[in-house]
Amino acid sequence: LLAGPALEGGRPTLKLDLAPEAAPAQMLGRYKLLEKIGEGGFGEVWMAEQREPVKRRVALKIIKLGMDSRQVVARFEAERQALAMMDHANIARIFDAGTTDTGRPYFVMELVQGVPLTQYCDQHRLTLQERLELFVPVCQAVQHAHQKGIIHRDIKPSNVLVTLLDGVPVPKVIDFGVAKAVGQRLTDNT
């Protein structure tokens, strides 16, 4: 399924034709795919292990096989560019991006291992005050995106994951898949 890594325009590329039920432990450049952790209409998100220059767990998002129309690719590229423009503690960070040798773009981002906002609040029986305090950083993250000219357009509990950092709950906004740029274009195709 996979060919050895190559470079195209300075970015790693290789052949990757994963079926949704493909076995894990395949390589995509310096990333070892471990487990599919999410799937949307056009893309799949895999937990992966970055092998170099540092070892760490990451999330790798790639367009589904057969869904690589111009419109879908443009939307995908807009999402990764939107993420690249933002630097906020409550927005999942992008680390890397590339294209397989079959033209399927992917990007690598911070792995947020958490649960949806409402699930966290319900499981921990948070009071209204505690829920509001947990939601303030979400509002700050959305404001940061707006200051960068990015509108998320899909804020919902499943796109705000709560993870623990040193025992403290930290909400993270994820999935800028339908984000829109205001007053600018994210890519030449959007």
Regions found by a protein language model. Name each.
Residues L14-T190:
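Conserved ATP-binding/catalytic core of the eukaryotic-like protein kinase fold
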